[in-house]
């Protein structure tokens, strides 16, 4: 009998601890509660302090030597196929005509 009363008492205390407001507001309609927090405050963004990191040395990269382009344009050489402009005007004379 004592164990039954003790277990009932423990069960009742556990119910009160685990569900403190469930039994009290079971039949009540939900009531709107205003938020506890105030309106948001505009704060300037916090600047993070820079973290000093040791410099990392990268291994040297092997680059093949390159020939630099000439700085000055070389003089133009006339090829043996170069054809000079004719000395006559728009129309060729009979001497320069190749038609037979």
Curated annotation (Swiss-Prot):
Write out the GO biological process terms: nodulation
Residues of the signal sequence?
A: 1-24
Gene Ontology cellular component?
extracellular region
The residue ranges flagged as biased composition, category Basic residues, are 72-89
Q: Which InterPro entries match?
A: Proline-rich_CW_protein
Subcellular localization is given as: Secreted, Cell wall
Show the segment(s) annotated as Disordered: 32-100
Region described as 8 X 5 AA approximate tandem repeats of P-P-[VQHR]-[NKH]-[EK]: 39-78
Residues in sequence repeats = 39-43, 44-48, 49-53, 54-58, 59-63, 64-68, 69-73, 74-78
Renumbered to this chain, the Basic and acidic residues biased-composition regions fall at 55-71, 91-100
Keyword set, alphabetical order: Cell wall, Nodulation, Repeat, Secreted, Signal
- Main localization category: secreted
Concerning its family, UniProt says:
Belongs to the plant proline-rich protein superfamily. ENOD12 family.
What name has this protein been given in UniProt?
Early nodulin-12
Q: Taxonomically, what lineage is the organism?
A: Eukaryota, Viridiplantae, Streptophyta, Embryophyta, Tracheophyta
